[in-house]
Amino acid sequence: MAAILYIVGSFIPLYLFSDFLQIHIDEIPAFIASFAYGPLMGVVVLVVKTLLKLPFTKTLCVGELADLLYSLVFVIPAAIIYKKNRKFKSAIIGFVVGFVLQIVVSFFFNIFVMIPFYGSIFELPQAFLDAKWTFALSAILPFNVIKNLIVIAITLPTYKSLHRLIDKI
C-alpha cells in the first residue's frame, strides 16, 4: 500500500489557491489500508509514504511532516470509527469526523506554526504575516474542504469495489 501511495502521490494543483496547495490523492490508499486492516496499517502507510518523500522535499521537511499530521488526523478517526462497526454508515460517520478534525487542525496549525515558520525562513513581508487569518480563511480552509471532499468521493467507491477482494487476502 505504501508503494501505491507513493506512486499515486502526484499533485493536482488547484489554481484558485496558492501554488503550494496541491491535492494529494495519496490519502486514498491509507484510507483503504486502514479500513481493510485497521488504523495502525493506515498509520504505517502514511509514515512510509512520508519517509519516501522526505529526500525530495522542497519544504525543509516541514511541509511533508505537516502533511503527515493532517493525513493522520483525517485517516485515524475514520478508521477507528469504521473498525468498531464495519458498515457503510460507520464509514460515512468516520469520514465526517476525520474531515472536521483535519480542517480544524490544519487551519490552526497553519496559523500558529506553518505561516510563522515559513515567514521567518523565507523572510515573508510583515503584511502577509499580519494577514495570516485572512489567508487561512480564504485559501487554506476552502482548499482543504475541496481536497477532503475529493479524497472521500474517490475512496468510498474504490473501497466498496475492493473490500471483498481485500477480505479474501
Regions found by a protein language model. Name each.
Residues 1-169:
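Loop-helix junctions at membrane interfaces
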